[in-house]
A protein has these predicted regions:
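Structure-specific nucleic-acid interaction/processing domains
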Residues: 2-103
């Protein structure tokens, strides 16, 4: 018999801040036990997408204009479960309206 998949995996809610413009982006990623590595890998994915996919999203434009070195990655919180993590992320985005959360 297959084990039931866990519904309460840990998610990191994070913020990317452009230190040149003080603009921010809020996102989430599954983090497991290695939060630091999960955030590093997720930021690398953002950078790779900005450079290779030529998306016209605010975050991608900012990464292309200022470079990855202009950004700092901040851990906002760790939330158990996908639905609560997404809800928490939406609450932050709707409350603060980060400039780089647009696509």
């Amino acid at each position: 018999m297959k084990r039931k998949r866990r519904q309460d995996t840990k998610h990191a809610v994070y913020m990317l801040v452009n230190t040149n413009t003080n603009e921010a982006y809020v996102g989430i990623t599954v983090c497991g036990n290695d939060v630091k590595n999960a955030l590093k890998v997720r930021f690398q994915k953002h950078v790779r997408r900005a450079v290779t996919e030529n998306k016209n999203w605010a975050l991608c434009r900012s990464i292309r204009a200022h470079g990855a070195e202009a950004f700092v990655v901040l851990l906002v919180d760790i939330v158990r479960g996908r639905k609560p993590a997404h809800a928490y992320e939406r609450d932050i985005i709707n409350g603060d309206v980060p400039a780089l959360n647009s696509h």
